[in-house]
């Protein structure tokens, strides 16, 4: 028994050393556009949502593409909020800025039922390629609650990641969502009959 005691202590020491070197978890959030605001405020209200996100990326951890059919779940690099909430939040802030819309809500918050236009978004791809690109492939529908007319579109955006690391990858996703938001804003303007 005394011969096994040093082995037990060595195993315990190795375990404690492993526990002491646990990597800290980092949290990331996407940001809205920094583009100039619309020149004239919108006279209509908007509701954004629901937003559908692929199940493979619908998790707290950032999911990165490591090959054509392979992903890595980054255990210590996480979204600060679920993507199903982050994407509509960023799109709402972008549309508010781009269209001058002050009356804009995220579905199903109060006020969203009375919106002039309802926007639903289906994120078909939300891919993260660290050091390379952020890819957002989105399809949307804008529906007028006044006359039930609809407009739709699709954007396939590949935004270059400017440097290594997760902060740059998340910034690239923010820029990709800015481009998607710009195309959604164009659809809303076309339906509202206003000029860009």
Task: Provide a role label for each language-model segment.
Residues 15-18:
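C-terminal motif of bacterial Sec signal peptides marking the signal peptidase cleavage site
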Residues 20-84, 191-196:
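A structural "domain/chain start" motif
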Residues 20-27, 35, 161-196:
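C-terminal/domain-edge helix-coil "capping" segments
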Residues 54, 89-101, 183, 187-194:
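Structured segments of extracytoplasmic/periplasmic soluble domains
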Residues 71-80, 146-182:
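Short secondary-structure boundary motifs at beta->alpha junctions and helix caps
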Residues 20-37, 42, 98-146, 161:
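Surface-exposed short loop/turn segments
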Residues 1-8:
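Bacterial N-terminal signal peptides that target proteins for export
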């Amino acid at each position: 028994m005394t011969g096994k005691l040093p082995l037990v202590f060595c195993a315990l020491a190795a375990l404690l050393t492993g526990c002491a070197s646990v990597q800290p978890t980092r949290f990331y959030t996407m940001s809205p556009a920094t583009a100039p605001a619309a020149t004239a405020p919108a006279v209509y209200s908007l509701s954004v949502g629901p937003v559908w996100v692929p199940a493979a990326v619908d998790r707290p951890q950032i999911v990165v593409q490591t090959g054509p059919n392979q992903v890595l779940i980054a255990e210590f690099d996480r979204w600060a909020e679920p993507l199903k909430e982050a994407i509509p939040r960023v799109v709402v802030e972008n549309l508010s800025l781009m269209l001058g819309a002050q009356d804009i809500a995220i579905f199903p918050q109060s006020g969203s039922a009375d919106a002039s236009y309802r926007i639903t978004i289906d994120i078909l791809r939300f891919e993260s390629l660290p050091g390379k690109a952020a890819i957002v492939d989105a399809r949307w529908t804008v529906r007028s609650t006044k006359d039930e007319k609809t407009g739709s579109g699709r954007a396939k955006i590949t935004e270059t990641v400017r440097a290594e690391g997760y902060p740059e990858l998340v910034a690239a996703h923010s820029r990709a969502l800015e481009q998607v938001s710009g195309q959604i804003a164009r659809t809303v303007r076309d339906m509202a009959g206003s000029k860009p």
